[in-house]
């Protein structure tokens, strides 16, 4: 009886010893010189090796996702098995992302003949940087004024409809596309991974980013808010050609490893498949109406028209006439800041009305916005115009041009008065910036309300009445505020004229 009671205890001791010996024997497996060692026990603890988890697959494991996104860039060969793929990109280079429709026949029939909206983002991979994303992006915007983090290369893209880029969200672009048609989007990432490292002393590793795509379908109100699919991949961005060098270095390192060591790493694939993920949480502006600063044109446009520049908004007038008034409300002041390329400072001036902004002194705005943007904002607030490089004054002497026109059009004025001479001339100012003969021709044609092509040649009357052809060099040597009398005569061809400056 005593012998029977001692047997389980002996078995427990033996089993415990075997487990310890087995763990000890496994702890050395997988170690390699020059690299961080890992424990095989940890590997066996991964979900892929857990029989109890693999025997109960989730309901959606075999589900085919409605869409698939493929980034046409090779993955790094220096990524270990079971780790997420990593893809190297060059700064500013266009990379294709293929938008594929994986729906089975009869699946999601409500999308047939309909468009969907996809939102592209470049976000931080590290959770620590995700918490401070707003501050990080604001710092980047401060160091790179006027630049964007993410752009679409429209001329190279196929099937992209209504692309938009919000000037306040530098890392986001969106567009509509038809899943039943071929769609390829070429993106450009303009920030590099080392721009967000803690401190830059040279040789530091850059932080990884994520390219995330969220796709939505249209709801009953015509707004694209119903989530369909999200996927993302991990990237690192290098200076131009830096990604190619990094890929080559990783490949050469892998070639030096033994076959046994290579088994621990993933092969390099020619393309990167974005894997399913949760939708981006801060999708508060997803709707069908364009936000301030969006380009809402439904036709194709060049990358310059879609880069989020406030100059391409459909509604604002030219900045020259868009003056800020003391009666401007805080909401209107925010729109004025967006239109005049001061989106960076809208948060600072959230509660400022037009009167508040106009009361700021030059020193105030420089202290708030920094020297460069401060001076620009101060000039915009005061409505200051850029002084032209050259100003000349002209007056018409002959009325031949008026007589030759089939219909009366506004002419430079020649008014008669009751002085001793009986007449006096009224001059018109012409402002020149480029100081070229072509620019002078265009300005004179504008003055006479005719086409520049109707002015065959412009001459300047020289000594003894000779006619000298106006060249760029002659225009550049005009004196500031020089006065000229314009004489016109009919050219050899009909409906064109020679203009003589006297």
Swiss-Prot record:
The keyword Nucleus applies. It is found in: Nucleus. This is Alpha-globin transcription factor CP2. It comes from the Eukaryota. The gene is Tfcp2. Belongs to the grh/CP2 family. CP2 subfamily. Residues 241-265 have a biased composition (Basic and acidic residues). Residues 241-268, 294-326 are annotated as: Disordered. Coiled coil: none annotated. Keywords: DNA-binding, Nucleus, Phosphoprotein, Transcription, Transcription regulation. Pfam families: CP2, GRHL1_C, SAM_3. One of its GO terms (cellular component) is nucleoplasm. GO terms for molecular function: DNA-binding transcription activator activity, RNA polymerase II-specific; RNA polymerase II cis-regulatory region sequence-specific DNA binding.
């Amino acid at each position: 009886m005593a012998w029977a009671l001692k047997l389980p205890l002996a078995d427990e001791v033996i089993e415990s010893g075997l487990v310890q010996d087995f763990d000890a024997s496994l702890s050395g497996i997988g170690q390699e010189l020059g690299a961080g060692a890992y424990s095989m026990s940890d590997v066996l603890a991964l979900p892929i090796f857990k029989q109890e988890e693999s025997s109960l697959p989730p309901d959606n494991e075999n589900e085919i996702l409605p869409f698939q996104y493929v980034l046409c860039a090779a993955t790094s060969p220096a990524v270990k098995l079971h780790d997420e793929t990593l893809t190297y990109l060059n700064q500013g280079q266009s990379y294709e992302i293929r938008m594929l429709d994986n729906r089975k026949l009869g699946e999601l029939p409500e999308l047939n003949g309909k468009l969907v909206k996809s939102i592209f983002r470049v976000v931080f991979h590290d959770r620590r940087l995700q918490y401070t994303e707003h501050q990080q992006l604001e710092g980047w915007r401060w160091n790179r004024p006027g630049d964007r983090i993410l752009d679409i290369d429209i001329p190279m893209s196929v099937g992209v409809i209504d692309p938009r880029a919000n000037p306040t969200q530098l890392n986001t672009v969106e567009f509509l596309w038809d899943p039943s048609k071929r769609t390829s989007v070429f993106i450009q990432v303009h920030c590099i991974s080392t721009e967000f490292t803690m401190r830059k002393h040279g040789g530091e590793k850059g932080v990884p980013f994520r390219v995330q795509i969220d796709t939505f379908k249209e709801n009953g109100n015509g707004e694209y808010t119903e989530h369909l699919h999200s996927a993302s991949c991990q990237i690192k961005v290098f200076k131009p050609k830096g990604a190619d060098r990094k890929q080559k270095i990783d490949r050469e390192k892998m070639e030096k490893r033994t076959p046994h060591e290579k088994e621990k790493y993933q092969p390099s694939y020619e393309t990167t498949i974005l894997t399913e993920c949760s939708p981006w949480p801060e999708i508060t502006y997803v709707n069908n109406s364009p936000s301030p600063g969006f380009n809402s044109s439904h036709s194709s446009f060049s990358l310059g028209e879609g880069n989020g520049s406030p100059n391409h908004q459909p509604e604002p007038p030219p900045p020259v006439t868009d003056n800020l008034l003391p009666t401007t409300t805080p909401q209107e002041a925010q729109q004025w800041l967006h239109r005049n390329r001061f989106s960076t400072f809208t948060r600072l001036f959230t509660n400022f009305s037009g009167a508040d902004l106009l009361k700021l002194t030059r020193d105030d705005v420089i202290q708030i916005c920094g020297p460069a943007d401060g001076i620009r904002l101060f000039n915009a607030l005061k409505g200051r115009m850029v002084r032209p490089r050259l100003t000349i004054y002209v007056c018409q002497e002959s009325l031949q041009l008026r007589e030759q026109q089939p219909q009366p059009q506004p002419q430079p004025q020649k008014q008669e008065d009751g002085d001793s001479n009986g007449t006096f001339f009224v001059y018109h100012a012409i402002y020149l910036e480029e100081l070229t003969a072509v620019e002078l021709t265009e300005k004179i044609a504008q003055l006479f309300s005719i086409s520049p092509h109707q002015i065959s040649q412009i001459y300047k009357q020289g000594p003894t009445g000779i006619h000298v052809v106006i060249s760029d060099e002659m225009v550049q040597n005009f004196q500031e505020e020089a006065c000229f009398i314009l004489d016109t005569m009919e050219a050899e061809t009909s409906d064109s004229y020679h203009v003589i400056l006297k």
